[in-house]
């Protein structure tokens, strides 16, 4: 059994397996689970955040275990870290503590309707139980009370990417991105390797997307040599964000003032429902003479 958070050590109460999540049994305020995605209406190629959130009136949570996995069918998925901090909230006039207990990034590679079937989770609560030890006498011990809840199903509809307006250089990325270029401080010397950092970032998934064509931004006498990539994903304001950082190595063949051209990246914006293009601002660099920079005072050797 896969553990999502802390491991449950001792069980003293075991309820019926996987109640369908509900907010009340009679008049008693009880825990319940919600499943959600950040966009129920999406487009083909979009990456969604699927979250399972526990709402409980009791903050003394000992741990959470995964009983059965959610079923996403053929959708590409990757589990991400869940939350560990409780937040206070209110539902229907009742006070609850909420926490995201499971999270996935889902890729909508195909258009159409997709049903995301919820998994089952075991929630453990810390309890103090009165005991009468034959040696120590009356007292209290800590135990764990357990309840199992299942997440409800969620339906997502993915619209196809439009053919109209699709550019020839469409990257396949879905989101909203921008491109920036920066040159590290320091002299750039003719004939020596120099560095340029291109950053592609924004809302959406860049994990499987080809990087923009950086080489074309370097015109003679600037010579592109190599590039290394670093990709990161994060969640910001409920949206999936990505960053692709490209460190480029280049050499200027002679001294002078030169321009590194704009770098462009085409993508589909699901909010405007249009193909758009991000483009960096051209960067001007000053290249110093190699012979001047290498001049140095004489070295004296005692003999």
State the predicted function of each range.
Residues 2-11:
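Sec-dependent signal peptide recognition
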Residues 21-303:
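Surface-exposed interaction/ligand-binding surfaces
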Residues 1-2, 303:
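Accessible peptide chain termini
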Residues 12-21:
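Hydrophobic h-region of N-terminal signal peptides that target proteins for export
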